[in-house]
Each structure stands twice: as C-alpha cells, then as structure tokens.
Amino acid sequence: MKKIFLRIVLLLILANVGFGDVIQILGSNYSIYKGNVYYGNEILEGANPKTAELIGFSLLKDDKNVYYMGEKIKDVKIKNFEKLGQNYWKNENKIYYRDKKIEN
C-alpha cells in the first residue's frame, strides 16, 4: 500500500514538472503568460499582469491604465476609476461606454 501511495505521489509530482508557465485566459482576447499581458498574440507594453482584470467586453484594467481591444485609453486616471456596469465606467466626471466618452 505504501509503495502504491509513493508511486501516485511521484506521478503527481512528475506530471506538474514543466507546467509552471500556465496561461491565464481573461475573456476571449486577453491573456497573461510568462509575466506579460496579451491582447490576441500582441504584448500590451506596460500592462501589469499582477493587477490586470477584465472589466467588460474587451475592456481590461490594471493598476495604471484601462485598455479597450488592446489599445490604451488616454487620459484615464486609475485612482478615480469606477466600474458602473457591463462596459460602462466612470473616470472623474466623465462616463464611458467601452472606450467612448458619453457626452452630456
């Protein structure tokens, strides 16, 4: 019985060797792999894989920026960022739908 248990443990250990670089899928287009954030197969330069999270359809947020379809949305202050609902978000006094500012 002890030999069977040791074989199972050894098999589980060996099965995990080489799988340390697991890809993390965020929605249908974003992913995190080997310390980089990707949109499709393109690296999002400057995106933080530790804080990246999908917040809506093709919208990704990290600790510094918001991205829509892999493009950084300009003039966004993450400190004042607030998600309102699916694909709607607020930054300071501006409300956005995806990457478009909604005019008053």
Locations of regions flagged by a protein language model:
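Sec-dependent signal peptide recognition
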Residues: 2-11
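Hydrophobic h-region of N-terminal signal peptides that target proteins for export
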Residues: 11-20
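Non-catalytic tandem-repeat scaffold regions and their flanking low-complexity/translocation tails
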Residues: 19-104
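Generic cytosolic/nucleocytoplasmic N-terminal low-complexity/intrinsically disordered segments
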Residues: 1-2, 60
